[in-house]
Amino acid sequence: MQSVQSTSFCLRKQCLCLTFLLLHLLGQVAATQRCPPQCPGRCPATPPTCAPGVRAVLDGCSCCLVCARQRGESCSDLEPCDESSGLYCDRSADPSNQTGICTAVEGDNCVFDGVIYRSGEKFQPSCKFQCTCRDGQIGCVPRCQLDVLLPEPNCPAPRKVEVPGECCEKWICGPDEEDSLGGLTLAAYRPEATLGVEVSDSSVNCIEQTTEWTACSKSCGMGFSTRVTNRNRQCEMLKQTRLCMVRPCEQEPEQPTDKKGKKCLRTKKSLKAIHLQFKNCTSLHTYKPRFCGVCSDGRCCTPHNTKTIQAEFQCSPGQIVKKPVMVIGTCTCHTNCPKNNEAFLQELELKTTRGKM
């Protein structure tokens, strides 16, 4: 009898030890998924190489670029889900609320060419497009860059032609042999994509195409960026332009950050409200914009997340115009710098020196 009690006591003791060991290991794993008190001193020099259709996003700690986690994959603060695909990190199964599984936000399904897609699901109707179902709405982006990069303005009668053996078409200049562009004037129009609705409105059959905004034309001071989109009732590819300012030219490059050991200051917010200016126009309202900082180790910082607002400008007495303006959310620092990055830093330093003199 005493032997049985002794054996039972040892088993209970072993179970308690295993339980404490398991809790300790879980605590260590959870700790690796939390945001550190401060970002690591160095992120990878090059952006991560993600699978086709997967975006590179800032981790949940806003430190480094990572590949967005997809549906069914594990997620955490350091490995965020692809929110643009309607995904969120479901942490209900983790008592510590540190890790989870990327799950689609409940939404309506989509129907495309007779096929039903769930909200958050990605698909390719052809080799030219990557589409995503978002709560009953289908959004598509082109896989062919030439499909949205329009020819130069001096290109007479531009038209697209198919290339044998290739998926993507290409632009050529010159009059059409049949003297009719036909459907080529609507580069994004696809009569077969009816989504099961028989109507004459061309916008219903339009696969949305919108490029990313180009880099700002100036490294400092007010410049402009462009994109091409067919988000209009005619489904026509139109060029859009917005004002942008990555940083003011009087920013000091020799002091990129106030934190000891840091070589870059990614994002810096203006301490005082300022009027935006371009040419002879001044904004009616003041703003406290965010700017991208500079690095002391040769890297350059560029906008990562941006949005566009409509700002009112007064260009002459009584003349008020509205202009789209880029607003910076976050910036990222990397080594993929423009060729004139060194000259840009020298220009900043020269202007700063003159200002001090």
Swiss-Prot record:
One of its GO terms (cellular component) is gap junction. The keyword Disulfide bond applies. Disulfide bonds join 35-61, 39-63, 43-64, 50-67, 75-89, 81-102, 264-301, 281-315, 292-331, 295-333, 300-337. Its main location: secreted. Residues 205-250 form the TSP type-1 domain. It is found in: Secreted; Cytoplasm; Cell junction, Gap junction. GO terms for molecular function: growth factor activity; heparin binding; hormone activity; integrin binding; Notch binding. This is CCN family member 3. The lineage of its organism: Eukaryota, Metazoa, Chordata, Craniata, Vertebrata.
